[in-house]
A protein has these predicted regions:
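Active-site-facing alpha/beta catalytic cores
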Residues: 59, 65-292
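N-terminal ordered "arm"
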Residues: 24-28, 32, 44-80
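N-terminal basic/disordered segments at the start of proteins
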Residues: 1-51
Length: 292
């Protein structure tokens, strides 16, 4: 087996393995039927019938976690989705970098400040961003908190969708600040006004019932970078990795012979590979052949 890149140096390997075993007993974060639904939607994207929006934090944190913050992220995706769908006439596939983006790759394993060298910050799922000897030590207990916050985020998103928060008739309430603070705010406010007028007409004319919160109106799929492979493998359900609907391999771990590429090549999830400026065409072809 090749060396697994970008893995933390856990001070207590036995404790780490016990926590991974514990996480294996936890409920899945997503389900195979949801993953298969995303695959069907992505087929329509490939045919030119749908359009993907993927958005979210570079890395989620334990501190910036609340119902309002999650709603805020969802509102931004909703606003973009509605505007792009109205402008292109294409249905939108919404994929969030959310509910699992708690681990970061690093260029260097350590960081030095004022002559003090400590382990690099690898995301809240591994250690703290605080430059402190104790807090920078990789702590596997953080994986449990990452799981619980991911699960709470998923529960809130599902609840909001079921209760009509994502109904397009609520478009005027979705992140109005996004429009007012944008240089193109006037243009997009006009689009929102047109969408609202269209919905009002449909409702007033009695052409259809003014309910858009059915299961086909808006779905938010989750995604994150698959870095810590032991954690990802804890969510395996046959060939599905149920930590997220879609997983990707980053630029630092995408060598065609890496364990990360080997892992995603065996999944039934939709997967992706980040293509950076250092890659060449031959590598892209080799990765494509490997994961397909």
């Amino acid at each position: 087996m090749n060396k697994i890149l970008q893995q933390p140096s856990w001070p207590n390997q036995q404790q780490y393995l016990k926590i991974i075993s514990r996480i294996k007993q936890y409920p899945q974060l997503v389900y195979p039927n949801e993953i298969n639904r995303l695959k069907l939607e992505l087929k329509e994207v490939a045919k030119g019938n749908k359009f993907i929006i993927q958005g979210g934090d570079c890395a989620e944190t334990f501190k910036n976690f609340s119902e309002d913050l999650i709603k805020g992220k969802l509102k931004i995706l909703l606003q973009m989705s509605a505007i792009i769908q109205y402008s292109t006439k294409l249905k939108i596939v919404n994929i969030g970098r959310i509910a699992g983006q708690y681990i970061k790759p690093r260029t260097h394993s350590h960081e030095t400040r004022d002559g003090v060298t400590l382990p690099a910050y690898r995301g809240d799922g591994v250690n703290s961003i605080d430059f402190n000897k104790h807090k920078r030590q990789p702590n596997p207990k953080r994986l449990i908190q990452a799981y619980h916050q991911s699960a709470s985020t998923m529960n809130l998103i599902r609840s909001l969708i079921m209760n009509g928060f994502t109904d397009i008739s609520q478009i005027k309430l979705w992140n109005q600040d996004l429009l007012s603070n944008s240089p193109l705010g006037v243009k997009y406010k006009t689009i929102v006004k047109n969408i609202t007028s269209m919905l009002d007409f449909i409702h007033d004319s009695g052409l259809v019932n003014n309910k858009y919160n059915d299961s086909d109106s808006f779905n938010l799929y989750t995604s994150h970078e698959a870095i810590l492979l032991d954690y990802e493998k804890a969510f395996m359900n046959k060939n599905f990795c149920c930590s997220a609907h879609m997983l990707w391999v980053g630029d630092r771990t995408r060598d065609v012979n890496s364990e990360h590429i080997k892992f995603i090549s065996k999944l039934d999830n939709p997967v992706a590979v980040k293509i950076g400026p250092t890659i060449n065409e031959d590598d892209i072809c080799k990765i494509y052949e490997k994961i397909n």
